[in-house]
UniProtKB/Swiss-Prot annotation:
This is Multifunctional CCA protein. CTP binds at residues 8, 11, 91, 137, 140. Catalyzes the addition and repair of the essential 3'-terminal CCA sequence in tRNAs without using a nucleic acid template. Adds these three nucleotides in the order of C, C, and A to the tRNA nucleotide-73, using CTP and ATP as substrates and producing inorganic pyrophosphate. tRNA 3'-terminal CCA addition is required both for tRNA processing and repair. Also involved in tRNA surveillance by mediating tandem CCA addition to generate a CCACCA at the 3' terminus of unstable tRNAs. While stable tRNAs receive only 3'-terminal CCA, unstable tRNAs are marked with CCACCA and rapidly degraded. Mg(2+) binds at residues 21, 23. One of its GO terms (molecular function) is tRNA binding. Transmembrane segments: none annotated. The gene is cca. It catalyses: a tRNA precursor + 2 CTP + ATP = a tRNA with a 3' CCA end + 3 diphosphate; a tRNA with a 3' CCA end + 2 CTP + ATP = a tRNA with a 3' CCACCA end + 3 diphosphate. Its cofactor is Mg(2+); Ni(2+). The lineage of its organism: Bacteria, Pseudomonadati, Pseudomonadota, Gammaproteobacteria, Pasteurellales. Comprises two domains: an N-terminal domain containing the nucleotidyltransferase activity and a C-terminal HD domain associated with both phosphodiesterase and phosphatase activities. GO terms for biological process: RNA repair; tRNA 3'-terminal CCA addition. ATP binds at residues 8, 11, 91, 137, 140.
Length: 411
């Protein structure tokens, strides 16, 4: 029985990156042998065992043979005769097919170390095309390692394009697409994930509402980048820069993607203007979120940002009644942190334009100021003044509007 450290741990170690999770491969063993040594078996798809002390994962070496569609359509062989090379060749990329034994010796049968040096994401074998999930994984790795200069090998891009064209991505479940997208949002450059998907044709399959934005022009004075799809990529990039201040970074990134989907529905005869794109965008934002089974809180936040982001841009011009309408829609009285995330999303939109990346966004401070004075209106005082039931809400709104009016002349 031989045990090897494999996968991401070896890759990240060779890149001098922090190693978070360690996965081990066991060659020449049976489940019974591991159980006898105190390992605990977990997982139903294939034998994975937890070390009795460290609780790290140990998997039996295996071979896979395609016998169906999608990423579940495989037969697996876990016999003790499966070699290290046979196990590693079933993996997706060469950089993920490097092993290390207990003495520190590296086993690299498929050129992973050279591809690490060349900053290349390259598939190991044609069997890559048997698992459509690998398309999303490679796009995510491109996002994760973008800052290190990694690119996808041309032959791998070509294979991913062929997989997309033959309809293999249709077998991906919504849950897997959303999970990989969430992981992409957690990288430093999530916009690269979507750029890769667009390059291989997968954006039109998985995110058609987003893909529809590319080629749709915007007024150059407000959007030097002109293209609505390019603008959305820039907004995602800016949202990631701001995400460290967000309560829900995933919701912030998803809202950045969804905020301008209405521009894909603009009539051609009024382009490059997009009158009413905010309200038009609510339906595609909801449909895309529902189709990917996005959680309710993330979906609701994206819809709110879609409908009200331009209100925030015009905060200094809004009537107090409109300011309060936005505040009530956001339910900022009960969810003040979501309000802060909303302001971050609007700031990302304002900065997600060529040459605007470092612009100030004073609208956020103004909105916070309005919120501060409106929140000081005491609901208990309204009740003590004799208002009841619906009249409480109406009077509360009136007093909040008055509070905003008092400070507005000073803006």
């Amino acid at each position: 029985m031989q045990i090897y450290l494999v996968g991401g741990a070896v890759r990240d170690q060779l890149l001098n990156l922090p190693v978070k999770d360690r996965d081990y491969l066991v060659v020449g063993a049976t489940p019974e042998q591991l159980l006898a040594q105190g390992y605990q078996q977990v997982g139903n798809d294939f034998p994975v065992f937890l070390h009795p002390k460290t609780k790290e994962e140990y998997a039996l070496a295996r071979q896979e043979r395609k016998n169906g569609v999608g990423y579940n359509g495989f037969l697996c062989d876990f016999s003790p005769d499966v070699t290290l090379e046979q196990d590693l060749i079933r993996r997706d990329l060469t950089i993920n097919a490097i092993a290390q034994d207990a003495s520190g010796q590296i086993f690299d049968p498929y050129g992973g170390k050279q591809d690490l040096a060349n900053r290349l994401l390259r598939h190991i074998s044609p069997a890559f095309s048997e698992d459509p999930l690998r398309v999303l994984r490679v796009a995510r790795f491109a996002a994760r390692f973008h800052s290190l200069g990694f690119k996808i090998a041309p032959e791998t891009v070509k294979l991913m394009q062929e997989m997309t064209a033959c309809g293999e991505l249709a077998h991906l479940t919504a849950e897997r697409v959303w999970l990989e997208t969430q992981k992409a949002f957690a990288t430093d450059n999530p916009q690269i994930y979507f750029e890769v998907l667009r390059e291989i044709g997968a954006l039109a399959v998985l995110f058609p509402e987003f893909d529809r934005l590319f080629g749709v022009p915007q007024p150059e004075q407000h959007h030097p980048e002109i293209d609505s799809g390019v603008h959305t990529l820039l907004v995602i990039e800016q949202a990631k820069r701001l995400a460290k201040n967000a309560e829900n970074p995933t919701a912030l990134l998803w809202a950045a993607l969804c905020h301008d989907l209405g521009k894909g529905l603009t009539e051609k005869d009024i382009l490059p203007h997009h009158y009413g794109h905010e309200v038009k965008g609510v339906k595609p934002a909801r449909e895309l979120s529902n189709r990917l089974k996005v959680s309710t809180d993330v979906k609701d936040f994206a819809i709110l940002v879609t409908e009200y982001h331009t209100h925030c841009h015009k905060m200094a011009e809004l009537r107090p009644e409109t300011v309060l309408k936005v505040f009530n829609a956001l339910d900022i009285w009960r969810k003040p942190q979501r309000f802060c995330d909303f302001l971050l999303a609007c700031e990302a939109d304002a900065r997600g334009r060529l040459g605007f990346e470092n612009r100030e966004y004073p609208q956020a401070e103004l909105a916070k100021w309005y919120f501060k004075v409106a929140a000081q209106v005491d609901v208990q005082a309204v009740i003590q003044d004799g208002f009841e039931k619906k009249a409480i809400r109406e009077e509360l709104n009136k007093r909040r509007i008055t509070a905003i009016k008092i400070i507005k002349p000073n803006v």
